[in-house]
A protein has these predicted regions:
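A generic local structural motif
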Residues: 22-24, 117-120, 145-146
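An amphipathic, basic-hydrophobic helix/alpha-beta surface used to engage anionic
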Residues: 1-88, 132-134, 150, 219
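Von Willebrand factor type A / integrin I
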Residues: 121-129, 141, 146-246
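Short amphipathic beta-strand/extended segments with alternating polar/hydrophobic composition
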Residues: 85-91, 188-192
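Short, electropositive alpha-helical surface patch
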Residues: 88-100, 217-218, 240
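A short, compositionally biased
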Residues: 72-73, 98, 172-175
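Von Willebrand factor
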Residues: 93-129, 141-142, 164-165
Length: 246
């Protein structure tokens, strides 16, 4: 949020056009930035190994960039009963955080899931310069809205990266199948037709658009990606073109 004395040349006019609120552009390469990264470790992120692998890659790349610029990062692994938090500072910790993320193992077979966004909303932490949310966003909009609202109170810049697997975007299932609720471990027998897939995609699109609208409401950044694009394309094309990094 703009404060008296800030450089008016750094006002983000794109955000102002959407929200009529004046925010100052923040970049990861400004000095002494404090970065919070909220990594969704709930069961839905682990169903497809591709999605969990890509989420860790994104968390590692963001952490490495911040630490290489001699900044602070706090990586919060949420959506689990026993939360983990890695706090690092400066380039000396850049390799260590990559090792920590690589070693994250979350085998929770048979364990009921808990809400990632509920934990984000309940967390009371010191204000940071920038916060990143890495999540599939597959939770109720009310929980997502409440978490984002609480983050907005701290008047920091928040970037939401919604990561979905291709199978979630374009399901390949047809006919009689057994579906498993990844959070509650309940099975349901269904007959999947093309019209059902189309209805699912319409509802998913609506859900994702609502998340984007919530981000716009508070002047937060939002982007959606999948596991298919190369990591460098997501990182240096999507994020850079959005002005999140430079």
């Amino acid at each position: 949020m703009y404060e008296l004395g800030d450089d008016v040349r750094q006002i983000d006019w794109n955000v102002y056009a959407r929200t009529e609120k004046v925010y100052i552009k923040r970049y990861l390469d400004e000095r002494e930035i404090k970065v919070h990264i909220y990594l969704d470790c709930s069961n839905s992120m682990l169903i497809e190994n591709r999605k969990w692998k890509r989420a860790k890659e994104l968390a590692g790349a963001l952490s490495f960039l911040a630490l290489s610029n001699d900044d602070w990062i706090s990586l919060h692994c949420m959506g689990v009963h026993h939360q983990k938090c890695f706090m690092k500072k400066g380039s000396r910790d850049a390799k260590a955080i990559l090792h920590d993320i690589q070693e994250l193992s979350l085998d929770r077979t048979g364990e009921d899931g808990i809400s990632f966004f509920e934990q984000v909303g309940k967390g009371v932490r010191k204000k940071s310069s920038v916060s990143f949310i890495l999540s599939d966003g597959l939770e109720s909009l009310s929980l997502i809205e409440e978490a984002l609202r609480k983050l907005s109170i701290r008047r920091e810049m928040v970037y939401f990266i919604q990561l979905l697997d291709e199978e979630e975007l374009t399901p390949s299932y047809q006919g009689d199948v057994k579906l498993l609720d990844s959070e509650k471990h309940k099975e349901t027998n269904v007959s999947i037709s093309p019209s059902m897939v189309e209805l699912y995609q319409e509802r998913l699109l609506y859900h994702n658009k609502e998340i984007e609208a919530l981000c716009n409401k508070w002047g937060f950044g939002y982007t959606q990606t999948s596991c298919l694009p190369p990591l460098n394309e997501i990182f240096f094309k999507d994020l850079k073109e959005n002005g999140w990094i430079r």
